[in-house]
């Protein structure tokens, strides 16, 4: 399913509101993952999205990308404003999984 991409400035603003730090490598990877997912939400995150990001960022393997995204999400969850997180994930008591986070933010921002 092809969709309309979301503006990068809106995406990055939302990530910063959730507590993501722009100086972490995972921040850029999360932003790119969400942007790619909005362009083709039918693709599998682990089987298609991480390898596609690894091609775009050759310094990272798909495994390293998954780990960096997970770390960035967990850090933002731990240190970010809880009320912002509740807007997107009202029922969670722990950080969302990568796929859940990417899909939810992509759908909310489209």
What are these regions (language model features)?
Residues 1-51:
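AAA+ P-loop NTPase domains with strong preference for DNA replication initiators
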Residues 7, 26, 61, 65-68:
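Helical mechanochemical/support elements of P-loop NTPase systems and associated helical scaffolds
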Residues 14-17, 33-37, 56, 75, ...:
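Conserved, well-folded catalytic cores of nucleic-acid-processing
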Residues 18-21, 40-41, 56-65, 77:
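Short acidic, glycine/proline-enriched loop segments that cap or flank alpha-helices
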Residues 55-59, 67-71, 78-110:
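C-terminal engagement/docking regions of AAA+ P-loop ATPases
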